[in-house]
């Protein structure tokens, strides 16, 4: 019998960084507020112990250790930054809750309070994400893009110390650790589409733990789930990993139908880019939130028709484990085949 049924504290697995523990802490606090005792358990991951770029150390490096502990039963649930999860399904687990999302936009933190358009040509801007690198280069500002790893504090320090003129990071991370005051510009999606699922958390547990799945469902936000499902379906259909130069942002918005009634629609924007910024393909779609996964796949197919595969194949070929023994790029599968009870598997 699981902790959810016995009343013993639920053990929440998390990485040990300030950001990860703050994120997991919001889940712990929500469970405690609902009358379910919970505590954090810190798990070391290979990603925390490596200074290599994420695209070199591999997809899932921040989540595999948490899943190992979850499978072993040493924790009852794990809290992930959803964008770090591989799209490949794992039938042992289920995403039982996706809490309300933080602002998914990227943020610029620059010296002297500068915004992106005020940075001089040759300014050193730190980021290692190919998606950000590609979109920054595509703006044609002549910036010098510098590789960047480390926790948020160490990234910000490289600007304060004068080593870099600016860094680009997820706004959600700064918000969660109370550092939004350092943001000099929130980058609008028209400038830079965020990573699929950026700003969203995934609360994962074992698929056979029915009582815990039911308990965690109370934390689920339907609009966030629909948006994340659409964005990750697009990523999976493009056969791209979480480090590929792919951006996506979905939002549930209200509109009027033909009879003047207010209805909810899912608006999804996506892009695929060449890492050198020479080309960025963009497309968008609007549809029923209940068809979120289908909309994501449809938009991905539109991007593929525009030439996205040719832009992404070079990046896919360099990711660890990206090639099969035949030399062909191995397509990852979408995790939507293992939905929670609240997720539309279409």
UniProtKB/Swiss-Prot annotation:
Region (Disordered): 317-346
Listed pathway(s): Porphyrin-containing compound metabolism; protoporphyrin-IX biosynthesis; coproporphyrinogen-III from 5-aminolevulinate: step 2/4
Swiss-Prot/TrEMBL keywords: Porphyrin biosynthesis, Transferase
Keyword flag Oxidoreductase: no
UniProt-listed PROSITE patterns: PORPHOBILINOGEN_DEAM
UniProt superkingdom: Bacteria
Residue ranges with Polar residues bias: 335-346
Biological process terms in GO annotation: protoporphyrinogen IX biosynthetic process
Group of enzyme by EC: transferase
Cofactor requirement: dipyrromethane
A GO CC annotation given for this chain: cytoplasm
One of the record's GO molecular function terms: hydroxymethylbilane synthase activity
EC code: 2.5.1.61
Pfam families in alphabetical order: Porphobil_deam, Porphobil_deamC
Post-translational modification S-(dipyrrolylmethanemethyl)cysteine, affected residues: 242
Function: Tetrapolymerization of the monopyrrole PBG into the hydroxymethylbilane pre-uroporphyrinogen in several discrete steps.
UniProt cross-references to HAMAP family, sorted A to Z: Porphobil_deam (MF_00260)
Homology family: Belongs to the HMBS family.
Record protein name field: Porphobilinogen deaminase
Origin species: Nocardia farcinica (strain IFM 10152)
């Amino acid at each position: 019998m699981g902790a959810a049924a016995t009343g013993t504290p639920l053990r929440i697995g998390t990485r040990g960084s300030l950001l990860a523990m703050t994120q997991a802490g919001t889940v712990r606090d929500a469970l405690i507020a609902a009358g379910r005792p919970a505590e954090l358990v810190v798990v070391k991951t290979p990603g925390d112990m490596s200074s290599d770029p994420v695209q070199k150390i591999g997809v899932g490096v921040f989540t595999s250790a948490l899943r190992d502990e979850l499978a072993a039963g040493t924790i009852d649930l794990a809290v992930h930054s959803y964008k770090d999860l591989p799209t490949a399904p794992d039938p042992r687990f289920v995403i039982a809750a996706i809490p309300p999302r933080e602002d998914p936009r990227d943020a610029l933190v620059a010296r002297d309070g500068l915004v992106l358009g005020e940075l001089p040509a040759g300014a050193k801007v730190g980021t290692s994400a190919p998606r950000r690198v590609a979109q920054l280069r595509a703006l044609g500002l002549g910036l010098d893009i510098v590789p960047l790893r480390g926790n948020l504090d160490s990234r910000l320090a490289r600007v304060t110390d004068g080593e870099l003129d600016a860094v680009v990071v997820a706004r959600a991370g700064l918000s969660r650790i109370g550092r939004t005051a350092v943001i000099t510009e929130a980058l609008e999606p028209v400038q830079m589409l965020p990573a699929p699922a950026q700003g969203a958390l995934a609360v994962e547990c074992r698929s056979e733990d029915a009582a815990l799945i039911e308990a965690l469902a109370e934390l689920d936000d339907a609009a966030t789930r629909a948006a994340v499902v659409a964005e990750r379906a697009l990523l999976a259909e493009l056969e791209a990993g979480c480090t590929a130069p792919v951006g996506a942002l979905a939002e549930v918005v209200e509109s009027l139908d033909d009879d003047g009634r207010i209805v909810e629609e899912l608006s999804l924007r996506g892009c695929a880019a060449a890492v050198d910024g020479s080309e960025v393909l963009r497309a968008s779609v609007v549809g029923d939130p209940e068809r979120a996964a289908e909309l994501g796949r449809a938009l991905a197919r539109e991007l593929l028709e525009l030439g996205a595969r040719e832009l992404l194949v070079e990046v896919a070929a360099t990711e660890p484990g990206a090639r099969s023994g035949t030399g062909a790029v191995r397509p990852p599968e979408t995790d939507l085949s293992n939905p929670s009870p609240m997720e539309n598997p279409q």
